[in-house]
């Protein structure tokens, strides 16, 4: 009996459950049918100064806070309304919003637009169109030149009228706040408040009741269908954004069927009117977004180059053009220090440096409490200007290892190597005192503005025919003089000629993902203010020296060796210093350095350590020069290539004509260059210390393991290497 009773009770309960489910489904179907026939959009009147923040159910318009768990854009008061709305078609348009990590916003799209007329004020427009839209702009501005303007408080009014036509099925995207998503139906109000350059635009989805809002209001009449409009965050940040103003009578082609007018006056009230047919869904907010200035961050906008400069360009021009009197002076040889004496003499007569040091601009601001190369050099120059000669550079040479780790007192070293170490040391000092940081700041110190220039490198893979080009920072030029080369012009012509990279010198092609035969060409992109040319007289294979005469001019025109010879900038350089290596056996293990210096009066002097002799220009031009220093007639403007991440930086060494030298390969960067970060703190040398074999060196600087890879200047440290640098194609 008990078993029968339990079985009957179970069947009775099952029947009751089925009966309740049938009743619920009947009621739900009845409600759905009733709502489909009876629900009509209502007109909402605006009044007062506030708006209700109550969210409305998308079906019955009852106040609620529950929203769709997937799309986050609609709200429901109960599961019945959610099921009903899902069956009506929400399942076709419901999708998860896309999250943009950079902007920290959700982007949602699934709305259609048709026939909307919107008038609202604006001072500028930025266009982001997706499809089938036509924008016509008529601007009345103070200038017709396209430019980028920054919206500022109380800016001058810009009069323009914009016509926007939008057809059906316009698919657009809009940002939705992660924290705020407000929906209203049947009524839209758009208000824009312009106070001190701020723009406030809020478009909301309104329900079937009265709402209030502060500021200027606009009425919209809606019939035959719901109007879906999402909540938009305030646009007060527009005063920090840049907007693009199109020139007069500009137009962009997009198709459409409704008009959007933007009056020029900021005080005009927005007027919104809309007529929609059955099945229409639109979002006025998305229309407005076509006319919103693009949001920009400080990281994405390039900051002013003047703000990033380490050294004032105006001060640099004054120092470069300043005629400071300094008579030639001698330096005492402290034991195999002729190489250092010759280099210090050349630096002492380099115009920007000499003016900077004589005026005492460094010592007044130097923060170093210990030994400082620039301070000691300044002290030496001030003594020379006082008429003392010869002078002892003991305070500089006693700290040679602080200038170059491999340098030491009493050792015979290479003059070019010491020049690079000295310039590197000065650069590190100026960087520590620089008010700015970054690659462009490194290139705009006093040293960077003085010696820095740019090369244009082009490489073509012979396998896939892929071409790449990149600008490279240069600090000096090392050119080969072997073979039939008899003049500086011929050496520069060979330097800028095509070279085949084959064998051990093959180029790593990023497209082929392997080492391939390639053709390479280097040209001068921007000439430096002080051009240092090193004639490679020392041979790495037999430790010999090329003692043949090389003709070099007093005035050097580098336009034939520039990547754009038709460019308006045709710099002419004047010779002002020459370093000569004298030897008896034509070897790099012995010899003596002397230098020739030209004063501001145009007089030439030969300086041999402590001895100073006046000479004629003809005598200088007949010498077997090792290093040539040329000064540009007028300083060049700040480089347009400075600080770019897509740019390679290197201290320059030359590309030789010989094909048997080993190159350092770098497969990750499609390059043969080394990677050394200048900002790492271990500034061994800004230049390559090994691409030219020392003429007076010991085993510390002349060993075969230290000889250069001549193709890209060996394994010298570079200013700032970008590991993720990408090649740029060119025609």
Swiss-Prot record:
Q: Compositional bias (Low complexity) spans?
A: 677-701
What UniProt keywords are attached to this protein's entry?
Hydrolase, Metal-binding, Protease, Thiol protease, Ubl conjugation pathway, Zinc, Zinc-finger
**What residue stretches are annotated with the USP domain?**
329-633
Per the record, what are the reactions this protein catalyses?
Thiol-dependent hydrolysis of ester, thioester, amide, peptide and isopeptide bonds formed by the C-terminal Gly of ubiquitin (a 76-residue protein attached to proteins as an intracellular targeting signal)
Can you tell me which residues bind Zn(2+) 2?
A: 68, 71, 90, 94
Its Gene Ontology biological processes? protein deubiquitination; proteolysis
Is RNA-binding found in the keyword set? no
Cited InterPro entries: Papain-like_cys_pep_sf, Peptidase_C19, Peptidase_C19_UCH, USP_CS, USP_dom, Znf_MYND
**EC?**
3.4.19.12
ZnF start-end (MYND-type) = 57-94
Q: Which residues form the active site?
A: 338, 592
The ranges of region (Disordered) come to 171-219, 262-281, 637-702
Keyword Cytoplasm recorded: no
- Return the Polar residues bias intervals: 207-219, 265-281
Q: Which GO terms describe its molecular function?
A: cysteine-type deubiquitinase activity; zinc ion binding
**Which residues does Zn(2+) 1 bind?**
57, 60, 77, 81
> What is stated as this protein's family in its record?
Belongs to the peptidase C19 family.
Q: Its function?
A: Recognizes and hydrolyzes the peptide bond at the C-terminal Gly of ubiquitin. Involved in the processing of poly-ubiquitin precursors as well as that of ubiquitinated proteins.
Protein name per its UniProtKB record: Ubiquitin carboxyl-terminal hydrolase 17
Q: Which organism is it from?
A: Arabidopsis thaliana (Mouse-ear cress)
Q: What is the lineage of its organism?
A: Eukaryota, Viridiplantae, Streptophyta, Embryophyta, Tracheophyta
């Amino acid at each position: 009996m008990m078993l029968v009773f339990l079985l009957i009770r179970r069947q009775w309960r099952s029947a009751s459950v089925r009966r309740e489910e049938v009743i619920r489904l009947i009621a739900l179907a009845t409600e759905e049918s009733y709502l489909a026939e009876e629900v009509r959009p209502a007109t909402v009147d605006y009044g007062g100064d506030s708006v209700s923040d109550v969210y409305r159910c998308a079906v019955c318009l009852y106040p609620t806070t529950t929203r769709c768990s997937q799309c986050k854009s609609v709200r429901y008061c109960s599961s019945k309304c959610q099921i009903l709305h899902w069956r009506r078609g929400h399942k076709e348009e419901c999708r998860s919003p896309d999250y943009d990590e950079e902007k920290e916003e959700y982007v949602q799209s699934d709305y259609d637009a048709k026939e909307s007329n919107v008038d609202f004020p604006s001072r500028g427009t930025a266009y982001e169109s997706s499809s089938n839209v036509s924008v016509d702009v008529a601007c009345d501005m103070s200038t017709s030149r396209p430019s980028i303007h920054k919206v500022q408080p109380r800016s001058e009014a810009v009069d323009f009228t914009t016509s926007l036509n939008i057809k059906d099925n316009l698919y657009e995207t809009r940002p939705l706040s992660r924290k705020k998503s407000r929906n209203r139906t049947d009524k839209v109000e758009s208000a824009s408040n312009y106070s001190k350059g701020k723009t406030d635009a809020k478009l909301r989805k309104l329900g079937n009741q009265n709402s209030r809002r502060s500021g200027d209001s606009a009425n919209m009449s809606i019939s035959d269908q719901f109007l879906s409009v999402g909540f938009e965050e305030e646009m007060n940040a527009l005063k920090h954004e840049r907007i693009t103003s199109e020139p007069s009578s500009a137009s962009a082609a997009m198709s459409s069927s409704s008009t959007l007018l933007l009056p020029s006056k900021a005080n005009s009230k927005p007027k919104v009117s809309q007529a929609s047919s059955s099945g229409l869904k639109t979002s006025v907010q998305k229309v407005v977004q076509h006319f919103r200035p693009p949001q920009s961050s400080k990281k994405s906008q390039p900051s002013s180059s003047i703000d990033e400069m380490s050294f004032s360009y105006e001060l640099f021009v004054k120092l470069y053009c300043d005629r400071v009197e300094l008579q030639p002076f001698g330096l005492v040889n402290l034991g195999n220090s002729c190489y250092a004496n010759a280099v210090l003499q050349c630096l002492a007569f380099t115009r920007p440096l000499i003016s900077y040091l004589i005026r005492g601009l460094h010592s007044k601001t130097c923060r170093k409490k210990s030994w400082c190369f620039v301070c000691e050099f300044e002290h030496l120059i001030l003594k020379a200007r006082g008429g003392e000669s010869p002078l002892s550079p003991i305070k500089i040479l006693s700290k040679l290892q602080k200038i170059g780790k491999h340098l030491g007192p009493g050792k015979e070293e290479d003059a070019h190597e010491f020049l690079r170490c000295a310039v590197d040391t000065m650069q590190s000092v100026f960087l520590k005192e620089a008010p700015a940081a970054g690659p462009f700041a490194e290139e705009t110190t006093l040293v960077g503005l003085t010696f820095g220039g740019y090369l244009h490198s082009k490489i073509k893979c012979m396998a896939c025919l892929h071409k790449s080009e990149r600008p490279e920072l240069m600090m000096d030029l090392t050119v080969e003089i072997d073979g039939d080369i008899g003049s500086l012009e011929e050496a520069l012509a060979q330097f800028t000629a095509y070279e085949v990279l084959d064998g051990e010198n093959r180029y790593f092609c990023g497209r082929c993902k392997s080492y391939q035969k390639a053709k390479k060409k280097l040209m001068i992109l921007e000439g430096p203010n002080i051009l240092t040319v090193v004639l490679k007289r020392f041979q790495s294979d037999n430790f010999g020296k090329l003692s043949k005469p090389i003709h070099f001019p007093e005035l050097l025109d580098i336009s034939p060796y520039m990547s754009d010879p038709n460019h308006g900038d045709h710099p002419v350089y004047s010779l002002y210093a020459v370093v000569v290596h004298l030897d008896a056996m034509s070897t790099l293990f012995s010899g003596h350095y002397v230098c020739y210096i030209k004063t501001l009066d145009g007089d030439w002097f030969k300086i041999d350590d402590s001895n100073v002799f006046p000479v004629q220009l003809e005598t200088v031009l007949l010498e077997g020069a090792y290093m040539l220093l040329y000064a540009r007639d007028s300083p060049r403007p700040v480089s347009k290539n400075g600080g770019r991440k897509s740019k390679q930086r290197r201290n320059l060494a030359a590309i030789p004509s010989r094909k048997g030298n080993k190159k350092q390969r770098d497969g990750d960067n499609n390059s043969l260059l080394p990677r050394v970060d200048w900002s790492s703190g271990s500034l061994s040398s800004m230049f390559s210390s090994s691409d030219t074999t020392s003429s007076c060196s010991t085993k510390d600087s002349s060993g075969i393991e230290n000889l250069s890879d001549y193709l890209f200047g060996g394994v010298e440290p570079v200013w700032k290497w970008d590991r993720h640098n990408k090649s740029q194609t060119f025609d």
